[in-house]
Amino acid sequence: MLAGLLAESHLMPLEQLPAKVGEHAEPAGLAHVAIYLTDLQRHVLRNLAGEGMGGCRHSVHTAELRIEGTVPGRAFQYGRLLPAASACPGKYRWWAPLLGGTERLGVLRATTEGDDPRTRQDVQLLADVVALIVVSKRDYSDAYARLIRTDTMNVAAEMLWRLLPPRAYSDGRVVISATLEPAYRVGGDAFDYVLDGPLIHLSIFDAMGHDMAAGLTAGLAMGACRNARRRNAELVEITEEIEKVLVEQFGGTRYATGIVARLNTGTGLLEWVNRGHHPPVLIRGSRWVTQLACPPGDPMGTGLGVAPEVCREQLEPGDRLVLYTDGITEARTDTGGEFGLSGFIDFLIRQHADRVPVPETLCRFMHRVVDHHVGEWQDDATVLFCEWLGSSPDRRDLAAAVAGVPLLRSATDAASAETSGIDGELPLRPDAMAPEHSS
């Protein structure tokens, strides 16, 4: 099944994927497969093939499903294979997360004859292969771009989304997640991260204004940062290169604040340069929170000549670093008050205590920011989150738990687990067999 699908994928456009998956999955005992992809803001799951009839009478591949309050939504949010009520008598229906690494792409639905550990493993393996194919095709598919949009996008957002890395990454050493709003009107915010051996480079930028020029400023800052970093420039030199590029382009009329940081995952040493930006927030354990003080340099692009400094902090395993922009703390409630830094951090701590995966935590937080917002956005809201797990790259179990990623075990191991299905799956709740979408 998987070998044939992979072989065909090299010469397959994205639009053919649902039909090809069905062709290869059904002979292996996985019937009525449907692929649902999340919208940009992660409110709904949309059928890649559109609406159509499934293989059982009255079974419909619904064109769109809500994420909140549904079984497929729960599989998406928590990264777990979940059962659901089947429209086919005597059959079993499953919802499996589609993950590009740890980036949540959507879910896959399949119907099977049995519910044994090997069957559950086959469903998740199919979902993993489908996710790899989606990731390999989406960057040059306008059909994908239209499918995941629920609103029209401005040109600045069109440019920035193409520059940004995936909103989630994890390995045994680190869990990274990011989010930004307004997704379709984003102007001057940007984030970036990259791996370089034991080093994790993190950066966040907030350009002056909320217009096309702000988007260009943020894009130039990201490009200059990457270019200098790939020439092995040190942190101060990287920010000076960004300054130089912005001054050359805008003559001092446009600037960007930002933080450029580097985490050594082998030692836990965090180094960063602050260029007129909010200080990073460090969360340790369940309660201890501090803002990491560092003498700031001037915003990049002003040409004021205030020399930046490199600051350092020794992290402990489990420490969570949070970088953010103005829009997070300045979002207004319906009574006119600000959401505030304390409300932001309290939310992160509560979600962590409830063992909510990091990508889902940031998604819920940003939904809450949007709900608090009244009127037109005056500034973008961006969060870049990084949790250092420790120096060993082999702590996959811990990374999977924090990031919400299913770990495949052998069928024998899965059969001996207390919870059914993929190892680490959440205990089955009474509502897990509820209808897969609600009215």
Q: At which residue positions do the language-model features occur?
A:
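Acidic, glycine-rich loop-and-beta core segments that form the ion-binding/anion-interacting portion
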Residues: 208-232
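Juxtacatalytic helix/coil linker segments
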Residues: 165-217
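Regulatory cytosolic signal-relay segments
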Residues: 126-186
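A short, aliphatic-rich beta-strand micro-motif
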Residues: 82-86, 90-100, 104
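Conserved subregion of the PPM/PP2C metallophosphatase catalytic domain
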Residues: 2-6, 22-24, 28-31, 38-77, ...
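Short active-site segment of divalent metal-dependent hydrolases/proteases
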Residues: 160, 209, 329
